[in-house]
Amino acid sequence: DKSLILVGFSGGFRRSELVAITRDDIEFVKEGVKIFVKKSKSDQSGEGMTKAIPSFKYVEFCPVDHLKHWMAENRNDLVFPISDKNVALIIKKHALRAGLDEKRYAGHSLRSGFATTTAEYGASERNIMAMTGHKSVDMVRRYIKEADLFKNNALNKISNE
């Protein structure tokens, strides 16, 4: 589950994209991992796109390290051999374990969480769209607006003193 969640979040994947990843779609490189997405909701022609996920400093949360270990232990051609509906169930299960309301989380939470979190840390619209494959700036701006609710909150000066 951890590999699926870390890769899904770090790549801003749709759940259908995650469960379609095969071993041939993955290339480990010095900087991290490149994952080729053959087809997605916004790419019906099947042009495909490559998502690059860098290695993280902290191994415990590194999607690249967890993916390497997962693939070494599991020899399936499909990297995550589950249905897209099971992705949602896994997210809900771990949200509940973390003490969160599982009804507020689903498979899309990985993708929306990526967009919101990277916006909070200052990623540009263009960079977020390059990773998620969004065609609409308006959709990405929704995530950024949500992130800005706290980042640019007028109470930050008071609450941090």
Each language-model region and where it sits:
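Basic, Lys/Arg- and aromatic-enriched nucleic-acid-binding interface segment
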Residues: D1-R15
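Conserved tyrosine-mediated DNA breakage-rejoining catalytic core shared by Y-recombinases
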Residues: G11, S16, A20-F61, H69
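Short, basic (Lys/Arg/His-rich) helix/loop patches that form interaction surfaces
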Residues: E73-L78, A88-A130, V137, L149
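Intrinsically disordered, low-complexity basic tails/linkers immediately adjacent to helix-turn-helix/homeobox/MYB/SANT
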Residues: S159-E161
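The alpha-helix within a helix-turn-helix
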Residues: G8, V19, M129
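Residue-level marker of regulatory loop/turn positions in helix-turn-helix DNA-binding domains and
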Residues: V7, V59, S83, G107-H108, ...
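Catalytic-site neighborhood detector that most strongly recognizes the C-terminal catalytic loop/helix
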Residues: T132-K157
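Major-groove DNA-contacting interfaces characterized by cationic-aromatic clusters
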Residues: M49-L96
